[in-house]
Amino acid sequence: MAKHHPLTDWLPTSKKEMEAKGWDEADVILFSGDAYVDHPSFGAAVVGRILEAEGLRVAIVPQPNWRDDLRDFRKLGRPRLFFGVSAGAMDSMVNKYTANRRLRSEDAYTPDRRSDMRPDYPTIVYTRILKELFPDVPVIVGGIEASLRRLTHYDYWQDKLLPGILYQSGADLLIYGMGELPLHEIAQRLIAGEPFDSLKSIRQIAYLVPKGKTPVPCENDRHLFSHEECLSDKRKQAQNFREIEIQSNRYEADRILQAVGDSTIVVNPPFPPMSTAQIDQSFDLPYTRLPHPRYKGKIISAYEMIKHSVNVHRGCFGGCAFCTISAHQGKFIASRSEASVLREVKEITEMEDFKGYLSDVGGPSANMYKMQGYDLSICKRCKKPSCIHPNVCPNLNADHRPLLDLLRRIDKNPKIKKSFIGSGVRMDLLLHNYKDKVLKKAADEYTEDLIVKHVSGRLKVAPEHSSDRVLNLMRKPPFRQFAEFTKRFQRINEAHGLRQQLIPYFISSHPGCTEEDMAELAILTKKLDFKLEQIQDFTPTPMTLATEMYYTGYHPYTLQPVYTAIKKEEKMRQHMFFFWYKREEADKIRRELHRIGRPDLIAKLFDRTTSSRNDRHTPPSTQPRKSKSKSRHS
């Protein structure tokens, strides 16, 4: 039976709601670029519930108006301890603009998808306003925008290097990564009466100090090239990124320092990966799992997408060059207990609009639940950004049995008709030739269960490209694995009398990719009988390897030059190869193949005899039909 929630079950968003709780002031006031949804997938709710669990009174101002007399920033008054600021669940510029730098018409994190409810760079805008209105109140920033912009970074939308967001915003502290552990310690210290300045010794915190007044040196401090040096030398920016990524992926990282202007940014090492008990505690907080009643009658699309889904772990050890997950969540997996997951599933089944279908049981990648190194002492010495590229690490315990057991226990709930896996699946973990027969059997069982029991007719996978040279730059497995997985998908479908579809995702204009590579991609996918729809142009986002290659023109680990399509016309020429089957693109593609000196590819691409409809190895069941674009994980 659905539970009725009184208004006081949510964090207060107005003075009236604070009074209903008997408060005359809040200890902490949060400002968020997203609508307030009280759910563990929405960062402001998580931060608020964590601080509330520490005994603090927390209020939230979602999507404040920054263009009027700033009454939204004043309405709850001055907090006793600090303001917290987050741009929201996405970097605001990714949220607001397309890969072509055009303003998006919709915002999934805003009621009724309105696109005018947040500024560019809310972290900076909100913080500057708060500092102007309440100059003596500390401001702590966090969330993915602040986290991935904590040091000098390339901003695609301004097409230039920007300094760390602390320097731009004037915030007092920055929490990077997932915030539960630093927030717990911040709350404990402030409740104990320690001064705000003492917080600078906490792990996973970044802060500014005047140049020349750096904190007591640590034995292994990592001093980056200054922001100004990076502005004058792109190779230095590339070298900086290499050090940042190495430290981001270490179990026990070093402190990072970078000079900018008259200040130095200090980034303390992160906390160790969360334990199962710690991550359970975060997910088990008393969320209503609903949007705030202020949005009654309005639709928040991001919530609609995830309201019947369950996140079972955090972190990803894939290390994809274009992905920010490992930079923000880390490469070490933090998994929830079965008991915690099953409690959440039970809560979902009791929701009024639940019809028996879980939309996703997954995480950043679908199949990494409870995976870690056999010998953690080896992991603690490791500096590699990926545990599976170029090969699966022999120290990785990639056992799919815990995930299989969890899925089967979920499906035993009598109110569950079907549990889907909507997160992206790592094919390389399923196809790896495990020496341990138990691991091989478990991977095969998971593959079959996935295809037979957990697919809604369409399985999303992300080969991303067909060129092994480009895939190596992406830190993705070779294309032959996609062909192998396609055959396995076909065999399992045939064995069970199913006609499901495989939906591959591809990227154009990734660093290292040429028009010739795109032509080869078109030919290979044609042979596999795919007419691609789920495609995207590469968008540089802060703190990824691919973005550094795009901006600097060098690979940060080798300092060798890397070609990248930068100009709009170059990117469009690559993108059109996805649509070789459209009549209006065919002549353009023919002309382009002549221009790049590869007319020999024309026959392979447009000769009907090369169609894979004559290839008995690829049945119609793998032919994707036209569909609306969906978000995906790498």
UniProtKB/Swiss-Prot annotation:
Cofactor: [4Fe-4S] cluster
Compositional bias segments (type: Basic residues): 625-634
Keyword Cell membrane attached: no
Cofactor note as given: Binds 1 [4Fe-4S] cluster. The cluster is coordinated with 3 cysteines and an exchangeable S-adenosyl-L-methionine.
Presence of keyword Iron-sulfur: yes
Keyword annotations of the record: 4Fe-4S, Iron, Iron-sulfur, Metal-binding, S-adenosyl-L-methionine
Ranges for region Disordered: 607-634
Molecular-function annotations in GO: 4 iron, 4 sulfur cluster binding; catalytic activity; iron ion binding
Sequence positions that bind [4Fe-4S] cluster: 316, 320, 323
Positions of the Radical SAM core domain: 302-582
Domain of life: Bacteria
NCBIfam families: SAM_YgiQ
UniProt record similarity statement: Belongs to the UPF0313 family.
HAMAP family: UPF0313
The protein, known as: UPF0313 protein PG_0934
